[in-house]
Amino acid sequence: MPSRREFIQAGLAASVVPVAFPVAEPARVASVPNIAALSSHRLTHVVCDARFRCSQAVAIEAARLGLPVVSIDGDISDFWFNDLAPVWSTSPRPIAGLTAHGPLFCLERFGWDHGLRVVFRGVHRFEDGGHVEHSLAGPFRTIAAAHGTLVSDDWPTQLTRLLNSCAVTHDTASTTVRGVIESELERDSDDTLFSWVIAPKHAEPATARRA
């Protein structure tokens, strides 16, 4: 288990490390079947940041799906030491969330010590005029499904379902989707939020895709 000193150092590093993600070409897919409502692995926690309304919306949908929700205010210390570290020390389990960069930075690095990796990452940049740009990378089926679900103004709800249905495979893709924001969520527009799934790195074999 990382010490408290290591935890603080990771948090400080997260505040100064620059973050840059290239804008990817849209994933090419003719038609996308509706992905399963439940993932092949059970999410043990969905981490949501109460400071952001979009993240609050994710928490509401996660609770509706019966997933354990963890509410933070940017500080994951209590969650890590009291809940997640004891679980990961015995049985590394997948978690997901919509947070600022700092919590993801720390949890990703703690996951490395337990054989977990970020298997899905979304960067959500808020733009003027009520729009949001979603830059996504992860399993192909999840990325392909995002094209039909994240364009609407209820994207936090749809995002929660994508996170819950994210199955780890070697077959990956990246894309950028531009959507809209509900008026009551626009207070998040000065922030860039990150969605993510951290899961065991072992993946299902890649399968061939039809052209």
Predicted features and spans:
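A short, well-structured beta->alpha microelement
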Residues: A27-I35, L65-W88
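C-terminal segment of N-terminal export signals and the immediately downstream linker at the start
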Residues: F21-R51, A57-A63
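Structural motif
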Residues: V47-F52, I72-G74, I95-G102
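Short, aromatic/basic amphipathic alpha-helical patches
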Residues: Q56-R64, C106-H114
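N-terminal secretory signal peptides and thylakoid transit peptides that target proteins
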Residues: M1-S15
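N-terminal secretory signal peptides
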Residues: M1-P2, T207-A211
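Ser/Thr/Gly-rich flexible loops in soluble cytosolic domains mediating phosphotransfer, phosphorylation
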Residues: I76-F81, F110-L163
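Short, charged/polar "capping" segments at the starts of alpha-helices
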Residues: F52-A57, F79-W80, P103-L107
